[in-house]
């Protein structure tokens, strides 16, 4: 549909690429940024902030981003991943867990090296977690069992005065 959201995003990306391409100097790279749902992106099972809108009707294909773009950095999906099998179209993922559904994710940023207008390499840089995410218990239990689980937690060796480093407990 010519008036759909996806078609509009496609037209906008084409125009922006043509504008940037016409003005760049030899050897300069074009880097695109987008905060959107891409077709084929893996979503968290139980995180509502990443839900596919209208069953994925507003998902944008990796082909929307011209092959002349050196790197397309996407945001909104919290799990690091490549899109459409293209190394240069990726979600870096969130640098910090945004919900308990991300407790087992590897959180990172992506460093992108560009030479002569092309990606020369990428490096995932893991972000250390400053506060643990603890789900106690891992599955529903009666209140007395939950209290038993909490009582069984080991005492921390050092209690930080900095509350931002205290664990998040669910």
Q: Which positions does each model-derived feature cover?
A:
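Extended recognition/assembly regions associated with phosphoester-bond processing machinery
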Residues: 1-170
């Amino acid at each position: 549909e010519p008036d759909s959201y996806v078609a509009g995003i496609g037209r906008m990306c084409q125009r922006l690429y043509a504008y940037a391409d016409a003005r760049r100097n030899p050897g300069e790279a074009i880097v695109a940024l987008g905060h959107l749902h891409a077709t084929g992106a893996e979503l968290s099972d139980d995180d509502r902030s990443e839900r596919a809108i209208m069953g994925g009707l507003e998902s944008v294909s990796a082909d929307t981003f011209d092959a002349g773009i050196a790197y397309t950095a996407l945001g909104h999906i919290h799990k690091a991943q490549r899109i459409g099998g293209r190394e240069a179209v990726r979600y870096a993922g969130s640098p910090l867990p945004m919900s308990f559904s991300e407790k087992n994710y590897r959180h990172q940023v992506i460093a992108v090296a560009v030479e002569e207008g092309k990606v020369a390499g990428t490096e995932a840089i893991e972000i250390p977690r400053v506060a643990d995410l603890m789900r106690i218990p891992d599955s529903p239990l009666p209140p007395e069992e939950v209290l038993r689980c909490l009582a069984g937690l080991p005492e921390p060796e050092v209690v930080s005065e900095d509350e931002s480093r205290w664990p998040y407990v669910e």
